[in-house]
Amino acid sequence: MKNMKKGFTISVMTAVLCIICICLIFHCFDGNKSEKDNIFRTNQKKIEILQDGSWTDYEIKGVNIGTGYPGVFPNEFGISEETYARWFNLIGEMNANTIRVYKIQSPWFYKAFAQYNETHENKIYLVQGVDFREDLMFSEENLLNPKQKNKVFQETKKTVDALHGKNITFDTDTGNMCYYSNDVSDYVLGYVLGVEWDEMFVDYLCRFNEGIAPYQGAYISSRQEANAVEIFFSQWGDYLLKYEDETYGTQKLLSFANWPETDPLVNEVSPKLSVASATENTEAFIDLENLQLSDKVESGMFASYNVYPYFPASLQYGKYTEYIDDEGNRNPYRKYLMELVDHHSCPVIITEYGVPASRSPAYKDVWRNLSQGGNNETEQGIALLEMYEDIQKAGCAGGMVFTWQDEWFKRSWNEKSLSNPDGRASWSNAQSIEQFYGLLAFEPGDGKAENYPDGKISEWSKEDVVLENNDTKLSMKSDEKYIYFMVQGLSDIKSGNSINLALDVLPNAGTTYTKNLDFAIPVDFLIQINAEKGSKLLVHDDSDLAVYSIAIKNKSAAVTDIYKKAEELMLPLKNNTDTFHVASRASGSVNNFLLNEKPLENVGMLKHGNANPNSENYDSNADYCINGDIVEVRIPWSLLNFYDPSKCMVCLLYTS
C-alpha cells in the first residue's frame, strides 16, 4: 500500500509539473508583447470599425449563443465543433455580424469560430462575456474585499488569455482539462462583464460600502458620485483593459451587463403596483456615466442592457405607456429605449431582446402582445422584427437577439418547482417559457418528432394501437416533449359531440365519476375534444398544480396574503370531489395576484391547427388536429404533472 501511495504521489507531481511547464511556454511572451490594431472604437453614440484604413459606423446585428443542447448541461461542453461550424454558417446566412457568449466556451467553439472568419469575407465578431458566479453575489462577504475581487479578476484573466489562444483551464465541475490554442482576438468586438444584477444585491453592496472612496485607475476611474457597485466596475474594467493592453498590445470595447431592474432611470410605476415591491426606496441602480475613461483608452465603452417589452411593470403601467410611435401605436418599449439612449453619452446596445415561442404566456405585454410566451414561431419572428425596428428608431447602436438556440435545461419562474433540476436537459418542457427563445428549435425524437398533429396517419403504426372497439381505434406514443393520442373511426366528430380521453397518471388521486361520465378506475385528467365548442385538458382538483405553484412555492414579502388567497381558491374545489377544471399555471406576477387581477392562465385550452413544419399553414403551438374521422392530439408532459418524464417521475399533491 505504501508503494502504491508513493507511485500515485509521483504521478500527480509529474502531471502538475507538466501543466506548469505548458503554462510557462504559453506565457513566456508576456514581456515582449506584439502591438495589434484596435479595430473597434466608440465615437460619441456610435460604434466604429476600422476597414481599409478608415473608420466607418458599425451597427451590431447580433444574436446570443447559449451553451445548452438536448441531453447535456451547459458545463458539460456538449456542443461539438461540427455543430458550431454549422451554426456559424447559418448565423452568417441570416446577415448577423455579431455573436455574444456569456462565459468562456469550449476550445472547439473558438476553433470553429476562427475557421469561419478565416474562410469568409463577411466576418462575425464576438462579444465575450466574463462570468460572475452567483455564489459571490449572494455570499455574506463583501465583494469589494481583495479576496472576493481576486476571484473575479482571475476569471477575467482566464477569459482574456483564452481569446488570445494562451490558456489552459481545469474545469472542477467536469474534471476536464481545456487547452485554448486558437487566437480569435482579431474577431473580438468587446466584453460585457457580469450578469443581470440582483437589485437587492446592488442595494446591499451600496449600503454596506457607503462612503467608500472613488477608484482612480490607469484606464478607468470612478467619479465622486459613484456608488459601490460602480466603483467595483471601475476596478474590474481597469483590470481587464490594463491586463490585455500590457500583455497582448490590444484593447477591446468594454461594457457591463445591466437591465431595467438596476438601470439609472427614474421609473414611475402606478402606485397600486407598489404593494408587493421588495425594492421600493432602494439604491439599486447602476450608471456607467459614473465611470470615466483615461486617455490611455483608445477603444471605448458602451452601455449594455437586456430589455424585453413585457418586463418590468414600468413598461406596462408607467409613464412610458403614454408614448405614441410614428405608426400611431402606444409603444412603451421604444420610449424606454429612447430614454436610455438620451441618458448615456456612449453607445447603447440592447444585448438581449426577444420573445419565446412557448406554448403558454407568463408575463404579458398588454399593449402590443409582445408577451413572454404564447407566441408560435411565426409570431415570434414578427415580434423580433418589431423590436429591432424599435431599437433602431430609438437611436441604439445595435441589438442582439436572445437567443440562437432553444435550451432544454432552462427553468422558468412559474415552472421551476414543478420539474427535476437534475433531469431538465433530458426532455423538452413545452410549458417552460425560458426554453423557447431560440431561433433554432430542437425537435424531440430521432431527427424529427414522433408525431405532428396534422390529420394524417402516416406516422402511426399497428404497434401504437392501445384500444380497439369495432371500427374505432385509440393509439398512443410519446417522445421527449409530448405524449400523443390518435382516435380514428368516429364518424360524428364534427357534429358537436365530445371525445373524452380519461387519463390515470397519479397514484392515490383522482375520481371514478364526474358529470355524465363514470370511470372504471380513478382518473386525474380528461382530454375533451369538441370540434364546435373547443377542446381542453381538464384536471381533477386533487391533481391541480396551478395554485400550488403560487401559494406554496412563491417566496415573496407578502406570502401571508398569497396563502390566504390560495386557500380561498382551493376550498370550493376540495369540497367537490368530482370537480374537473381547465388546467392552469401561474401567470403575470405576484403583483397581479395580490391585486385580484388574473393570476392564472388557462393553459389547458387546446389549440386546433396543423403542427407539421412542412405544412403551409404550420402552427408550432397547435395541440390537436381534426381531419375527417381522424383526431390527433398532443399534451405536454408537464401538464400531466410529470416532474421528469425521462425518469417517469410525477408530482404528488395532498398525499403523505
Regions found by a protein language model. Give the residues of each.
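Active-site-adjacent substrate/metal-binding segments within catalytic domains
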Residues: S34-Y116
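Aromatic-lined substrate-binding rim segments of carbohydrate-active enzymes
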Residues: T83-L144, K151, L241-E246
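Active-site groove signature of glycoside hydrolases
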Residues: K158-A226, T250-P260
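Aromatic-lined carbohydrate-recognition surfaces of secreted/lumenal glycan-active proteins
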Residues: D171-N176, E230-L288, C346-Y353, V401-W404
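Glycoside hydrolase catalytic-domain groove-lining segments
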Residues: T279-V366
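Aromatic-rich peripheral "rim/lid" segments of glycoside hydrolase catalytic domains that contact
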Residues: Y363-N369, E379, D390, A394-A397, ...
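Order/disorder boundary and secretion-linked terminal/linker segments
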Residues: W427, Q431-N554, A558, R585-N610
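Conserved small/polar residues in nucleotide/adenosyl-binding loops
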Residues: Y654-T655
